[in-house]
Amino acid sequence: MDMMITGLYGTYFPVSEMTGKIPCFDSSTGRIFKDLGYDTNFFYFGSSAWRKIGSYTTSQGFNKSYGMENIHNKQKSTWGIYDNEGFDFILESLDKHHDKPTFNMILSASNHPPYDIDTKKYYNIDTEKIRNFLDTNYPKEKRFQGITPEILTVTEYSIKSAADFIKKTYESYPDSIFFITGDHFDRSYPDPDRKIFTSTSIPLIIYGSGVHKYKLKYTAGSHKDIVPTILNMTAHAGYKFHSFGQSLVTDDINENIDKERIAIGAQSIANGRYIFNGGGNLNILTTKKKMKMI
């Protein structure tokens, strides 16, 4: 998460927990988008006290930072506000303050232990169907430790909540662009034979206005490349900014995809063909096996 907020390389030392006053780095995301004229907001569906994320994000250029304590009259789980309730709050906030463009960074919280979300209250998610899928493809004796149908049910709930928010927001603000990613790899993946790709990678999904004008430039990237990608698609021509990353897309349809460019993450390095975790383990990236859906 630090890399997305400060633009610095990711390490296992949380910048937010440093003692003393933290400077606003030139590469900080909030600072850059504020410079571009955006109203910058950070939303976290858990407590703002977690890793001091409330004061941390405002110190890095976000105009406002919202935590669960700012989101009133919404259903809460052990970890924080229900994802769909938090997304509703954000949409309400956008409707109240639509007089200028906004940049909004959102960190949801429902997909965390103890997975105590009342999913049936909001979505008709069939837990038994998920249970059958697990039993068919990953019998208990061959399943990664602790993975249960309830965990995957909450995962599906979180996905549906985000999808609903994107749909509603895009209908109200059709010039919006959404960048969907994770702050860490998927810990609920049931396969016990976890390759480096599974245990270190995250997705990046780009959806919205004008996305069709761009094509993939590199096959491998990391968190540090996401903000440069957003800026490539939204900032005015010639805008200069500080970053350790590069845009992952290009508007030059004739440019070939670079499969050799190396992406550096906190736990691994990779290009379009290989991924290495620094511990002597090298994986060749291949197509995953097909699974039977129930």
Placement of each model-derived feature along the sequence:
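Solvent-exposed soluble domains appended to multi-pass membrane proteins
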Residues: M1-I294
